[in-house]
Amino acid sequence: MAIIIDPIADMFVRMKNAISRKYYEVTLPHSAKKVKILEIFKKEGYISDFEVLTNEKSTFKEIKITLKYKGMNQNQSAISGIKRVSKPGLKVYSSSEKLPRVLSGFGTAIISTSKGLLTDKEARKANVGGEVIAFIW
């Protein structure tokens, strides 16, 4: 098993690869931060669902993500793009006044704040800044 330096970026890459291959499900290693990010994705309508899987034979948990497709033939992903902003080597922070707007408000920024993980809209409403984790549109 390989060591993953940035598990959030790994999750995004797995999702992008699954979308490019038109897969409906993708499985990845579990972490609490990934679950919080996926809760935001589900709430904002970027994925259909996700669930945490436990295996009796192993102590490792996994997350199964059900991707969301739209359009006449259900062939266009609800996710057009994902960008990891703050990385382990370069953290990006933003004050509440300077929170980024993704595609003039049509996308979502995920912000890690003192109140937990929030979307850019929720962080503006709560008047808190924090680490800019990712953009999704």
UniProtKB/Swiss-Prot annotation:
Q: Does the keyword RNA-binding apply?
A: yes
Matches recorded under Pfam families: Ribosomal_S8
The GO terms describing molecular function are: rRNA binding; structural constituent of ribosome
Gene3D superfamilies, per the entry: 3.30.1370.30, 3.30.1490.10
Q: Name one GO cellular component term.
A: ribonucleoprotein complex
Question: Entry's InterPro entries?
Answer: Ribosomal_uS8, Ribosomal_uS8_CS, Ribosomal_uS8_sf
Name the Gene Ontology biological process terms: translation
This protein's superkingdom? Answer: Bacteria
Which keywords fit this entry according to its UniProt record?
Answer: Ribonucleoprotein, Ribosomal protein, RNA-binding, rRNA-binding
Q: Subunit comment for this entry?
A: Part of the 30S ribosomal subunit. Contacts proteins S5 and S12.
What biological function has been recorded for the protein in this entry?
One of the primary rRNA binding proteins, it binds directly to 16S rRNA central domain where it helps coordinate assembly of the platform of the 30S subunit.
* Family label: Belongs to the universal ribosomal protein uS8 family.
Name-wise, this protein is Small ribosomal subunit protein uS8
What is the organism field in this record?
Metamycoplasma arthritidis (strain 158L3-1) (Mycoplasma arthritidis)
